[in-house]
């Protein structure tokens, strides 16, 4: 039985939108939602690490490894000890590895142009800036997290034989997730129903 949900996905894949839909649909049943990206963006803006008027989003290198881990491990703690959370962040599915009762959802968009267009509309920036921001954040975040979470990758993913020790650290490997939704061919309403049906199927 699924007691919590994680939603992971790279920018433009629709993970934040899915969180918003699920919060609305599940609120009467006592579910709560948390967006790691929105929390970190507010923190970075408050501390002056990021100027929201500059367009685009910041990358994870603007704050310390310690703060990054603190926020992430708090999410893992919620998944281990609490119920009825929908946690959305780049790494939430990775943080849920080996935690029982968590439905791990990965949002993807197989059409890169569609992802870019969504970021353009979300951030009111040019397609060129959206592409550059998307690629820059991915490269910097992945490099940082591969270093910061190398031991957790070994403990949570390699040791349980989910992947080979020689495989590169890839937090968004589809085989680490319970549900993978391609929002290029699946609408947000359909995506919401897929998740709801997955939860109900185990009740």
Provide a role label for each language-model segment.
Residues 4:
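Walker A (P-loop) ATP-phosphate-binding motif of ABC ATPase nucleotide-binding domains
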Residues 7:
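Hydrophobic anchor at the beta1->P-loop junction of P-loop NTPases
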Residues 10:
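P-loop (Walker A) phosphate-binding loop of NTP-binding proteins
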Residues 16:
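Walker A/P-loop
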Residues 24-33:
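Post-Walker A helix-loop "phosphate-sensing" segment adjacent to the P-loop in P-loop NTPases
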Residues 36-98, 113, 124-132, 139-141:
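ATP-dependent small-molecule kinase phosphotransfer cores
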Residues 127-191:
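Small-molecule kinase domains that catalyze NTP-dependent phosphoryl transfer to phosphate-bearing small molecules
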């Amino acid at each position: 039985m699924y007691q919590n949900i994680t939603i992971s996905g790279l920018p433009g894949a629709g993970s934040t939108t899915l969180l918003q839909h699920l919060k609305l649909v599940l609120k009467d049943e006592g579910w709560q939602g948390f967006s790691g990206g929105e929390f970190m963006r507010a923190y970075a803006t408050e501390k002056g690490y990021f100027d929201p008027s500059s367009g685009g989003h910041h990358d994870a290198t603007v704050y310390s490894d310690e703060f990054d881990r603190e926020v992430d491990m708090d999410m893992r703690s919620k998944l281990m000890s609490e119920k009825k959370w929908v946690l959305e962040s780049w790494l939430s599915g990775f943080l849920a590895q080996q935690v029982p009762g968590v439905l791990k959802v990965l949002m993807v968009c197989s059409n890169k142009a569609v992802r870019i267009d969504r970021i353009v509309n979300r951030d009111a920036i040019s397609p060129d800036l959206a592409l550059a921001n998307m690629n820059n954040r991915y490269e910097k975040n992945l490099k940082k997290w591969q270093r910061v979470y190398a031991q957790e990758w070994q403990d949570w993913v390699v040791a349980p034989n989910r992947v080979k020790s020689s495989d590169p650290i890839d937090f968004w490997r589809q085989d680490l997730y319970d549900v993978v939704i391609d929002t290029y061919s699946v609408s947000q309403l359909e995506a919401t129903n897929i998740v709801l049906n997955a939860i109900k199927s185990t009740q």
